């Protein structure tokens, strides 16, 4: 079943926590893309269905166990509804099962863009930002990385059509993002 007749381009953003995925998504939104943050879609369900004391990541794992590994992708496509955007972005792809589900539902104009940043830079960013799901302890950040890798995020990064390295200043990162976006929109 396809939800859209795809004359649009779809970008699936992946990357480890703190790599710059959300910043890339913001830049795409500024260019007119429809952006759906996958963790926000999970959080919406979490607020209704989570067990007392259950962590968001554990809730997402439980959803996958019950409904299959592509469930978050399906929920995100449902969230998309009918879109009149030329570019649709899903921020936070974590497994190849999700990639396959997006391709099954949205067609072949789906491109994986990985945002990569070295661990020391990512950890520094996460300690400095004020997100509720970020720990301030390096050991917890390393544990979170391992959990993400167990979900299959490393395989998605390895299969990326494009990789943006985020190891410099914001202006350089923005330039790299624009370059990749232009390539996707022009050539696919």
Swiss-Prot record:
Q: Which CDD domains match?
A: DPCK (cd02022)
- GO-annotated molecular function: ATP binding
- Which Pfam families did the record assign? AAA_18
Query: Is the keyword ATP-binding assigned to this protein?
Result: yes
Q: Which organism is it from?
A: Saccharolobus solfataricus (strain ATCC 35092 / DSM 1617 / JCM 11322 / P2)
Entry's family note:
Belongs to the UPF0200 family.
> What is the name of this protein?
UPF0200 protein SSO1041
* Keyword annotations from UniProtKB, A to Z: ATP-binding, Nucleotide-binding
The UniProt annotation places ATP binding at: 15-22
InterPro entries in UniProt: NTP_hydrolase-rel, P-loop_NTPase
Tree of life domain: Archaea
